[in-house]
């Protein structure tokens, strides 16, 4: 149960922050956002506020912000259609009833001669008594009602495509940006709470560790590993990681006296068939805002670059599905994190948040990076890709992403039962 709650909490926070970034900058640019969704599939909960429907959906595989103009959302109303008009006291259209007009006795039923729901916002009809053409202005926040479902209209000035390119790009980039900010803030908060390890002073971790076997003690300060001088915890651990399972020389100071010993390092598998050396020591934490900022920045860079390194294996032929995880694999890792304590769970959330930001910036159609790629093409070419072509490419990209998710999930399940 703890694992399930942690998984749901991490997923919800990461997706919420990502989609909130899209929503905030889209609304700031004046773009109408029809829906803000956490999850996919059937709707579990919904409420409406400021022209946007906020929903929680069943499947924890993502989320979305549906912006006006990105795809056809409104029912089509053409000349010759018979619709109902709900007017205010100034004869401005507040609602356009597409069907089931008998359920709306307040609506005036007319036959459409001309209609513009995008630019000039009007509907023209013939007055049955006089035979004259009558034009009704349409409120920019009028609703179209079809099958008793009301949806606000999207005038051109509130559509995604009407905004300057930088504002559109920011509305797309804001999702990954918020994940990066969240990841950094989590790392900073953890380091301020736990303290950060700056010096190479050590504390022995458990009995029978390589450090204890080599005669090292709490309070020793390591000054060199295999002849390479180290002045900080980061430099020391970087050198140790280079020698998995090997014997190394350790220079250290104890009570001001320079000493040396040899240690046979353990090895830890960090990726399939990839190992790092392990000495079995911890650092001595220090509480410093500057040190915490430095730690958070370094960890952020390390996490981001490790993701890029993994993705880079695709181009060298060394990539394996074991290097990535879908929802099932993430749930399994969450279970391991829960067993290690709340601070490990929070650290894992930071890693996932940064991971989500990086993956979403990949130039793959259906991801934010793919959408930014289309905007970059528009900026260079001077005009956007045709909606038909972009829609087809986005659909293919989405299908490939879904296929990859299915394959990865199957691989995760296979690993669980192997």
UniProtKB/Swiss-Prot annotation:
Residue pairs linked by disulfide bridges in the UniProt entry: none
Transmembrane segments: 5-25, 170-190, 345-365, 390-410
Cofactor(s) demanded: Zn(2+)
Organism name: Shouchella clausii (strain KSM-K16)
Protein name: Zinc metalloprotease RasP
Domain of life assignment: Bacteria
Family note: Belongs to the peptidase M50B family.
Organism placement in taxonomy: Bacteria, Bacillati, Bacillota, Bacilli, Bacillales
Residue ranges constituting the PDZ domain according to the UniProt record: 183-267
Binding site for Zn(2+): 18, 22
GO MF annotation: an example: metal ion binding
Membrane topology: Multi-pass membrane protein
């Amino acid at each position: 149960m703890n694992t399930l709650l942690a998984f749901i909490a991490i997923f919800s926070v990461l997706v919420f922050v990502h989609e909130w970034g899209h929503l905030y900058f889209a609304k700031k640019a004046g773009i109408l956002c029809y829906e803000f969704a956490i999850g996919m599939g059937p709707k579990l909960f919904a409420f409406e506020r400021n022209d946007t429907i906020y929903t929680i959906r069943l499947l924890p595989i993502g989320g979305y912000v549906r912006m006006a103009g990105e795809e056809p959302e409104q029912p089509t109303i053409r000349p010759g259609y018979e619709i109902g008009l709900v007017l205010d006291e100034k004869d401005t259209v507040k609602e356009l009833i597409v069907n089931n007009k008998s359920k709306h006795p307040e609506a005036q039923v007319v036959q459409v001669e001309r209609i513009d729901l995008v630019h000039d916002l009007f509907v023209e009809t013939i007055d049955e008594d006089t035979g004259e053409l009558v034009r009704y202005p349409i409120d920019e926040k009028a609703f179209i009602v079809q099958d008793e479902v009301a949806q606000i209209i999207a005038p051109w000035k509130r559509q995604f495509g009407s905004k300057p390119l930088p504002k559109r790009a920011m509305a797309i980039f804001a999702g990954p940006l918020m994940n990066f900010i969240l990841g950094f803030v989590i790392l900073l908060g953890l380091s301020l709470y736990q303290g950060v390890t700056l010096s190479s002073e050590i504390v022995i971790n458990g009995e029978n560790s390589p450090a204890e076997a080599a005669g090292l003690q709490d309070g020793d300060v390591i000054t060199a590993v295999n002849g390479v001088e180290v002045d900080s915890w980061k430099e020391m651990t970087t050198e140790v990681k280079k020698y998995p399972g090997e014997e190394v020389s350790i220079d250290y100071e104890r009570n001001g006296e320079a000493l040396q010993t040899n240690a046979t390092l353990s090895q830890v598998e960090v990726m399939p068939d990839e190992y790092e050396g392990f000495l079995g020591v911890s650092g001595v934490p220090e509480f410093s805002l500057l040190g915490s900022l430095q730690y958070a920045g370094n960890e952020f860079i390390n996490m981001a670059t490790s993701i890029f390194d993994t993705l880079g294996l695709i181009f060298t032929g060394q990539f394996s599905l074991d290097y990535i995880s879908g929802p099932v694999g993430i749930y399994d890792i969450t279970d391991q994190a829960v067993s290690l304590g709340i601070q490990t769970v929070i650290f894992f959330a930071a890693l996932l948040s940064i991971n989500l930001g990086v993956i979403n910036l990949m130039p793959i159609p259906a991801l934010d990076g793919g959408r930014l790629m289309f905007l970059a093409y528009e900026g260079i070419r001077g005009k956007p890709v045709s909606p038909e072509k972009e829609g087809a490419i986005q659909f293919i990209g989405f299908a490939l992403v879904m296929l990859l998710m299915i394959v990865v999930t199957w691989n995760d399940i296979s690993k669980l039962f192997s």
